[in-house]
Amino acid sequence: MERTERPASRWIDLTRPLGEGIPVYPGDPLFQARPFAEHSTDGFRGTRWAFGSHTGTHLDAPFHYFVDGETLDSFPIDFFVGDAAVLDLRSTVGVDSERFAAPRSVGRPVLIEPSDLEPFESIFDAVPFVFLLVGWAERFGRADFYNAFPSLTPETADWLADFPKLRILGLETPSLVAFPTGDFSEADAVGPIRSFDAEFLPDAFPASPPFSPPETQGSAESGADESSVVADAELGAPLDEAEFCADAECHRILLGRRPPILLLEGLVSLERLPSFAPPSEPGERVEFDAAKAFETVVFPLLIERSDGCPARVAARLRADAADVER
């Protein structure tokens, strides 16, 4: 039997590296790394890591918002491999758009409405992974990274949920709906510490002081461990109620669809990939072009009962595909 030669290919990493000092979502635990063995004393090196399930480039599972939702470890491994496409929205709702400048001046996010995505219907019908490029990854580490980034609306989430082929929606942004400007301080941008289990943490790890959580937190119904919850003051300023409700609603719509749409947040280097640009004229549609699609792997760690997890994400391009540098 003759062997079929596969076309040459190359990989582009879409993952943000994890390490101490990486900014985290306000209220989430900092990434921490401490050696438990050293070359000089033990003859080998071993490291204890502590980090939240939604740190860096990560996937959200239905269990993130639904007590009976699927966990990441329940999905077959081939769920995380598929063809992907990038929608370049920088000029319409992203950092290069007129809409971005005006709302930012009053601290409100640009809203990504169904009408912004409707020209790309053919792409959503064609590939299981769709990534939205808005130019936000370049703002990582700035105090405004969580402020007013281009945000989905519940109506847009409903629109996306109607595409049966879609199984992973990828974003550069840290969530689906932004904090309004001014809702948290620059100190919060590097992440207040939420304590882990005392038995897990060595003395070298800082931990938040104990407290009595409100009745609405750590209840038996939610299954939350009260020792892992910290007071509001420990988490930085809370989301505005409207933004929190919109973020939760968008998550619930997409993660709650049957089958669910998983959410991949914190992507980088999307600008290096082939992409679909918006149409030049209102009312025009963008036709799917298979040459602009690419195979992608999105591999989270295999952790039992995971509501989310950092993931290694990589796109495989044909060797003759342009590596776009902008």
Spans of features found by a protein language model:
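Active-/binding-site microenvironments in catalytic and ligand-binding cores
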Residues: 1-326
